[in-house]
């Protein structure tokens, strides 16, 4: 089949997939959502659901349509989101449903895209979100205890749940009203907390279920990680491998639903990079459907950014960047494409999955077949599983032999033909690159505003004998609290030898501190996500007479999980000085003054009005407790923008007055690098000219070395073997509930052939082939190498098929590239890396 013919088939198949992806059957007059053990039922019809979490406050509203469209293009038919109480009611009785918190707009966009929705109201959501979504003011309600049979908590929880349900009803967003919402969630992962509260926990969860049902949404309610969910509430699974770790609801009338399949591991400051492969995620989903599951949600499908102070304790601004759509909303391949292909394969099997008789057939040690079959209608699907993590294998199923890669599942959509293998990736790969934006260096002039004098005890208004707990003072309005005290030393107190210095020892409940003695910087200390409490010990110089200690304590968000959140603490609790001639001096009860927040925060220097009210000076390097600013024009084009803060220490970033999050590049993980140093600047924040980049730096750094970059995924790759099944999206179609080969798709002498397809981003074409090898190449996208077997003609063939095209197809076959099938070690693998870019203007191209 010619490349042009294959591309025509591809285009038709993609269009058909987009049209059919949602299986959307809601009506404007309202839809009845029920369920049985097999699935949710939409107006009497069973359905399978592929869902993805996209949290509306973690992405700018102008990006929502694109994110939802890409999710649908990826084969999803459901979008899932939490509701964030502290975002919607930051002050008691003061509500916010605008901008990134316009949840009505978000769910209406889902409806416009003809997709279903799941709303996870909570209102405790965890979600690596500040305080788990609970507003700080709730802590100050008398006698309150969160998430137990506590009347004050239940009162305010019911008020908020009712508020959200009523707003969604007013907008007619529940399926019973013709809207997209087919499920609603109450509470979140409560089962492990129920043990802590014992009988009160059981009473609370039963109350929560009854309260939710009484809101009369007309759709089922769910509880995640609550195996024995009360009454008609459906329990759901959260985890990486729910097909193996979760037996399903105890009530056999309820379906197997998976609300969180973690597409990566969320990261905190101090974490090294972590990944979860596309193959492992695909295996977990195929496994879940093979044991009777009919809804799987990817948490996250797009993580986005924890803007401002929204991240929970120690959680970085960058959230689930390894999701199928990365932090910037770009396709992360092959994860996005491999899961899209899985969804397409499972849709071929929908009738068998929803109505077939399930059975299990052992095929050998660590091998099995799980079958759903309607013999009378000749409808069948089989999942051939290899649970051996080290070895590939061959099994015999219904008289035919099948190769099954290690730890994989092959899907036989007619119980005969392999249409998908979780281990064999047919979708393209890509590599993300960052590019210096030349135009942003113009007028690279930094100015600074240093915090007013470091506070002294005598100038403070909040004074106590001992240091105060921090959260009770800052009330989640700021990360910062000053602790200061003064003490007198005599000559006999100080060490006689110059090489001996007193040591300042500060113990803190968390999270980090910067210490000053007599206005001189002494040092920093911090805890970790796991161990927030810490002790800092730093040598210092003291003098005869009065000495002043000032400690700036900072938090990195409130805790988002566990029992008794309302009692969690932060801040300094003991201070001593060791190494004096007269022994250890305990300053803990010396009398302490406190100052809430920074001078720059009170002056709002990050705002246009505030920055004009203070005197800015020429910027200098390595200045602690300093606000820095500069102007810049945005990079040209539409590529995402990031700021590289590698040369800085710890602080908070603003662009045009909007808080983009905490940074902490001085804190290195075990591999010797910061957990995050690139920070997303949404294009919607940028003006055509004269943007303000500002940050508060706690420790000191070199602002002149900060870079503004753009983000691309223009390096596209493929890595496929002849053992890959033919591409499910355009090689197969469903006809009479059975998969049929698309006429001629990829067909050759050996029948259907695996075919690699390379496709550039919008408005770009393949301009060069960086690498091409057929045989046994090695490596990953962006770093391929030729193996011991290599067909020399490979690059020539690929260039002829691909250069100048937006999309090209490459049949994976030794005949095409002149590969030596007898070469020892050959794996019949094609590896290609190509570079996409915009075509140069015709005049420029002619001149060259």
UniProtKB/Swiss-Prot annotation:
GO cellular component, one term: vacuole
Pfam families for this protein: BetaGal_gal-bd, GHD, Glyco_hydro_35, SUEL_Lectin
Positions annotated with a glycan in the UniProt record: 29, 261, 472, 783
E.C. numbers: 3.2.1.23
Alphabetical UniProt keywords: Apoplast, Glycoprotein, Glycosidase, Hydrolase, Secreted, Signal
GO MF: beta-galactosidase activity; carbohydrate binding
GO biological process entries: galactose catabolic process; plant-type cell wall modification
Active-site residues per Swiss-Prot or TrEMBL entry: 189, 260
Catalytic activity: Hydrolysis of terminal non-reducing beta-D-galactose residues in beta-D-galactosides
CDD domains on file: Gal_Rha_Lectin_BGal
All residue ranges annotated as the SUEL-type lectin domain in the record: 750-837
Signal sequence region: 1-23
Primary localization class, coarse: secreted
Keyword Glycoprotein assigned: yes
Localization of this protein: Secreted, Extracellular space, Apoplast
Similarity remark: Belongs to the glycosyl hydrolase 35 family.
Protein name: Beta-galactosidase 11
């Amino acid at each position: 089949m010619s490349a042009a013919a294959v591309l025509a088939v591809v285009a038709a198949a993609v269009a058909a997939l987009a049209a059919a992806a949602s299986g959307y059957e809601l009506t404007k007059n309202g839809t009845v959502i029920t369920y049985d053990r097999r699935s949710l039922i939409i107006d009497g019809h069973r359905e399978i659901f592929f869902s993805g979490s996209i949290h509306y406050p973690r992405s700018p509203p102008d990006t929502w349509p694109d994110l939802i469209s890409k999710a649908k293009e990826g084969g999803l038919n459901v979008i899932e989101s939490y509701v964030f109480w502290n975002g919607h009611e930051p002050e008691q009785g003061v509500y916010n449903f605008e901008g990134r918190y316009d949840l009505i707009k978000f769910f209406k966009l889902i409806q416009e895209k003809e997709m279903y929705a799941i709303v996870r109201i909570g209102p405790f959501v965890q979600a690596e979100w500040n305080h788990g979504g609970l507003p700080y003011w709730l802590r100050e309600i008398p006698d309150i205890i969160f998430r137990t049979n506590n009347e004050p908590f239940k009162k305010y929880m019911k008020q908020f749940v009712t508020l959200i349900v009523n707003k969604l009803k007013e907008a007619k967003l529940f399926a019973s009203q013709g809207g997209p919402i087919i499920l609603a969630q109450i509470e979140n992962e409560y089962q492990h907390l129920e043990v802590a509260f014992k009988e009160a926990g059981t009473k609370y969860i039963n109350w929560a279920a009854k309260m939710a049902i009484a809101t009369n949404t007309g759709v089922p309610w769910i509880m995640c990680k609550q195996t024995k969910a009360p009454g008609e509430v459906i329990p759901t699974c959260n985890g990486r491998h729910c097909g193996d770790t979760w037996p399903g609801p105890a009530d056999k009338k309820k379906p197997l639903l998976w609300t969180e399949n973690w597409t990566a591991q969320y990261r905190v400051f101090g974490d090294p990079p972590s990944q979860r492969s596309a193959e492992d995620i695909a295996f977990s989903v195929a496994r879940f459907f093979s044991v009777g599951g009919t809804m799987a949600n990817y948490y996250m499908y797009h993580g986005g950014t924890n803007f401002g102070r929204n991240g929970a304790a120690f959680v970085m601004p960058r959230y689930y960047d390894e999701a199928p759509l990365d932090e910037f909303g770009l396709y992360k391949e092959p994860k996005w494409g491999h899961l899209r292909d899985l969804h397409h394969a499972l849709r071929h099997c929908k009738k068998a999955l929803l109505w077939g008789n399930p059975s299990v057939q052992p095929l050998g040690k660590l091998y099995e077949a799980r079958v759903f079959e309607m013999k009378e209608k000749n409808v069948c699907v089989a999942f051939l599983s290899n649970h051996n993590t080290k070895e590939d294998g061959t099994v015999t199923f219904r008289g035919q032999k099948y190769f099954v890669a290690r730890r994989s599942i092959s899907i036989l959509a007619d119980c005969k033909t392999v249409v998908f293998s979780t281990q064999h990736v047919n979708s393209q790969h890509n590599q993300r690159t960052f590019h210096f934006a030349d135009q942003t260096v113009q007028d690279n002039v930094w100015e600074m505003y240093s915090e007013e004098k470091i506070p002294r005890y005598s100038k403070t208004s909040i004074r106590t004998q001992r240091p105060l707990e921090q959260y009770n003072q800052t009330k989640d309005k700021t990360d910062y609290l000053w602790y200061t005290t003064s003490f007198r030393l005599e000559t006999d107190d100080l060490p006689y030898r110059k090489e001996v210095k007193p040591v300042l020892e500060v113990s803190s409940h968390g999270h980090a501190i910067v210490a000053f003695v007599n206005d001189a910087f002494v040092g920093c200390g911090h805890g970790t996500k796991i161990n927030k409490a810490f002790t800092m010990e730093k040598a210092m110089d003291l003098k005869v007479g009065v000495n002043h200690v000032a400690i700036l304590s900072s938090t990195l968000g409130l805790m988002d999980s566990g029992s008794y959140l309302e009692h969690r603490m932060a801040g300094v609790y003991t201070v001593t000085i060791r190494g004096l001639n007269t022994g250890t001096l305990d300053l803990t009860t010396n009398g302490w003054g406190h100052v809430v927040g920074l001078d720059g925060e009170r002056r709002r220097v990050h705002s246009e009005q505030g920055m004009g009210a203070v005197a800015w000076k020429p910027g200098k390097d390595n200045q602690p407790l300093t606000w820095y600013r500069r102007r810049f024009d945005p990079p040209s084009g539409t590529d995402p923008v990031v700021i590289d803060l590698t040369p800085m220490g710890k602080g908070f970033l603003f662009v045009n007055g909007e808080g983009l999050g905490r940074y902490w590049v001085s804190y290195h993980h075990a591999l010797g690098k910061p957990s995050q140093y690139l920070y997303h600047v949404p294009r919607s924040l940028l003006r055509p000219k004269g943007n303000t980049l500002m940050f508060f730096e706690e420790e000191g750094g070199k602002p002149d070395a900060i870079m503004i970059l753009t983000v691309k995924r223009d390096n596209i790759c493929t890595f496929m073997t002849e053992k890959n099944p033919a591409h499910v999206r355009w090689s197969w179609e469903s006809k009479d509930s059975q998969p049929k080969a698309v006429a001629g798709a990829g067909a050759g002498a050996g029948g259907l052939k695996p075919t690699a397809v390379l496709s550039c981003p919008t408005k770009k074409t393949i301009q060069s082939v960086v690498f091409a090898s057929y045989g046994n190449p090695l490596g990953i996208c962006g770093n391929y190498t030729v193996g011991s077997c290599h067909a020399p003609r490979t690059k020539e063939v690929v260039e002829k098929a691909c250069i100048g095209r937006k999309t090209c197809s490459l049949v994976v076959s030794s005949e095409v590239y002149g590969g030596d099938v007898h070469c020892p070690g050959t794996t019949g693998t094609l590896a290609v890396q190509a570079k996409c870019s915009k075509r140069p203007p015709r005049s420029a191209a002619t001149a060259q």
